[in-house]
Amino acid sequence: TTFSSSNYITDSGASGTALATGQKTANGHISVTPEGDTLTTILELAEKNGLSTGLVSTSSILHATPASFIAHNKDRHDYASLARDFLKTDVDVFIGGGYDQFGNREDGLDLISRLKDKGYQVERDMKKIQSVTDGKLAGFTADGHNPKFSEGRGDMLPNATETALNVLGNNSKGFFLMVESSQIDWGGHDNSTDYIVSEMLDFNRAVEKAMQYA
């Protein structure tokens, strides 16, 4: 079923939580129960079992779907707290938008320095992101959300997918990778067939990278 615990029509927080944890929750929640108790995600289980883990998204990496795999919050829009949750995990690779919540925060916290202290290679240029072949990678492709494919995003999604696969593939135990083409959904919100189709075709290129890797 696709309904959330609070509404016949789900949202990305509740549906992302269902994908990440197998549990229903209320709209707007990020991997917590309707009452606010923490739910364990598949990414966290993978980490616990020695697998490498990664996230790729054409939105901000803090948007509801990717955040549901790594963060826990009753408010999907509490981006400042969601960013801090990234420092509480050992996720190996994440590539997407959202730099401002790590490096230009209103509370003055410098999460970029903290990421570097944890051993992450932090890059903001796609070519530099693609040059990373091992270790931990935090790739920021936009200050907030990435632009639409039709407005110049280019090959960010397939290239980010390929990079994540190559880095995570160094672990002989295996890995978990979540790749989201976020803006297919946004095209639906806009009731724009052109937007949906261009994003779907771009996502198909990312799927091709995954199939080639497999």
Give short role names for the model-derived ranges.
Residues 1-105, 109-129, 135, 202:
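N-terminal catalytic scaffold of extracellular/periplasmic and nuclease hydrolases
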Residues 40, 80, 157-162, 204, ...:
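Short, well-ordered alpha-helical scaffold segments within catalytic/effector domains
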Residues 64-69, 144-152, 170-174, 178-211:
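Active-site His/acidic residue clusters
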Residues 75, 153-161, 199-203:
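Phosphate/oxyanion-binding active-site loops and adjacent basic polyanion-contact surfaces
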Residues 125, 129-140, 160-182:
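Active-site regions of oxyanion-processing enzymes, predominantly non-cytosolic
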